[in-house]
């Protein structure tokens, strides 16, 4: 089965072709980072318009790269939610228009399910069941993944997602957009232990997260430093230490909660998905913990940590292989800007 995947939930336009026998044939991605940088964040209307401009050229790109023809495609999967309403509508409209014109079925995919399943795109995918740490700009969750569509929420953030905390801390430090990668790069120049920040809910006894207090702690300590050194020169030199302190604190919490989830479920496989999963400090800490504790940790390829069409094509193919009745030919679609992943549980 050959499935075309279309991702347009936020500020990346992604298209891909996935074959259930041959794997990922081709994927193409356009990021809107440069367009949104001058505004310091994603502008929804601009994002929607750019998806319209980019989708069809990307389709031609993946068809050319894969050698496939439109007649070879068996179904079209698109991101149905969650995400920006306008951006979702663009992707859904394009998917259903193509499907109508080509006489193909469609299937709407949960964006986070795509992330959860994205590590299955590697050469040696992890078998079910596993614990998944889903960590991105909008979500931070620990899930038990028993099979496609069989998900149990173990813990989640009570306020800011980890990626959101990265972005907000970047703004406090006067860094550019997107903030998460900038904070991580600056942290590598910081001195370990020079700035010590709290580890929120580290010993809460559950698997939930909270990152809003960590961001506030950065702001409070920065203000104290500014007051002590009027001129700001010391503060400029200290920014790397603040970034290091923030990243160390966030990583410590993510690793500790992941270990606790593995212990609670008695599983030995951890999958890390979402944009923050590309963070080098997080990967290094989890790899060290895996070696010490005797469990396996799996990641998608770095290029597939961000939003992409490959994960949507994969999720669509896996769902249609198990539940062919989920394919739709009525082309009357809806999008779900808010959509609880737990609602997919079978």
UniProtKB/Swiss-Prot annotation:
Q: Which GO terms describe its biological process?
A: tRNA threonylcarbamoyladenosine modification
Please give the catalytic activity noted in the UniProt record. Answer: L-threonylcarbamoyladenylate + adenosine(37) in tRNA = N(6)-L-threonylcarbamoyladenosine(37) in tRNA + AMP + H(+)
Matching entries from Pfam families are given as: TsaD
Q: Which UniProt keywords apply?
A: Acyltransferase, Cytoplasm, Iron, Metal-binding, Transferase, tRNA processing
Q: Does the keyword Transmembrane helix apply?
A: no
Q: Indicate where this protein is primarily found.
A: cytoplasm
Instruction: Output the Gene Ontology terms for molecular function.
Output: iron ion binding; N(6)-L-threonylcarbamoyladenine synthase activity
Gene Ontology cellular component annotations, sorted alphabetically: cytoplasm
Q: Which cofactor does it need?
A: Fe(2+)
Which cellular compartments is it found in? Cytoplasm
- What's the top EC group for this one? transferase
Which cysteines form disulfides?
A: none
User: What does the note accompanying the cofactor annotation read?
Assistant: Binds 1 Fe(2+) ion per subunit.
Sites binding substrate sit at 134-138, 167, 180, 279
Q: Does the keyword Cell inner membrane apply?
A: no
Record-listed E.C. numbers: 2.3.1.234
For this protein, the record's NCBIfam families field holds: gcp_kae1, T6A_TsaD_YgjD
Q: Which family does it belong to?
A: Belongs to the KAE1 / TsaD family.
Q: What does this protein do?
A: Required for the formation of a threonylcarbamoyl group on adenosine at position 37 (t(6)A37) in tRNAs that read codons beginning with adenine. Is involved in the transfer of the threonylcarbamoyl moiety of threonylcarbamoyl-AMP (TC-AMP) to the N6 group of A37, together with TsaE and TsaB. TsaD likely plays a direct catalytic role in this reaction.
**Protein name from the UniProt record:** tRNA N6-adenosine threonylcarbamoyltransferase
Organism in which the protein naturally occurs: Burkholderia pseudomallei (strain 1106a)
């Amino acid at each position: 089965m050959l499935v075309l995947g279309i991702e347009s939930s936020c500020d990346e336009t992604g298209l891909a072709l996935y074959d259930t026998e041959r794997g990922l044939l081709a994927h193409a991605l356009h990021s809107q980072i440069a367009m949104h940088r001058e505004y310091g964040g994603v502008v929804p209307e601009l994002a929607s318009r750019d998806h319209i401009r980019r989708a069809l050229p990307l389709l031609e790109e993946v068809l050319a790269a894969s050698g496939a023809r439109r007649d070879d495609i068996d179904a079209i999967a698109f991101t149905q939610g969650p995400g920006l309403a306008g951006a979702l509508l663009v992707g859904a409209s394009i998917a259903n228009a193509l499907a109508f014109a080509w006489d193909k079925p469609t299937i709407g995919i949960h964006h986070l399910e795509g992330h959860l399943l994205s590590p299955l795109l590697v050469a040696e995918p992890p078998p079910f069941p596993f614990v998944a740490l889903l960590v991105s700009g909008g979500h931070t969750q620990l899930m038990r993944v028993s099979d496609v569509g069989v998900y149990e929420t173990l813990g989640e953030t009570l306020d800011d997602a980890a990626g959101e905390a990265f972005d907000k801390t970047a703004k406090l430090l006067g860094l550019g957009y997107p903030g998460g990668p900038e904070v991580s790069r600056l942290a590598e120049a910081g001195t370990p232990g020079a700035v010590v920040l709290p580890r929120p809910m580290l010993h809460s006894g559950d698997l939930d997260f909270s990152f809003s207090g960590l961001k506030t702690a950065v702001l409070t300590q920065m203000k104290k430093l500014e007051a002590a050194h009027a001129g700001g020169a010391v503060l400029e030199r200290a920014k790397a230490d603040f970034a290091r302190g923030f990243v160390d604190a966030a990583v410590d919490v993510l690793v500790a909660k992941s270990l606790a989830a593995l212990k609670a479920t008695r599983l030995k496989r951890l999958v890390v998905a979402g944009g923050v999963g590309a963070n080098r400090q997080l990967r290094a800490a989890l790899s060290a913990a895996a070696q010490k504790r005797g469990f396996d940790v799996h990641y998608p390829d770095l290029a597939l940590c961000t939003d992409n069409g490959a994960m949507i094509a994969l999720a669509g193919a896996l769902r249609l292989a198990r539940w062919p009745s989920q394919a739709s030919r009525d082309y009357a679609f809806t999008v779900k800007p808010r959509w609880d992943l737990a609602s997919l549980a079978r």
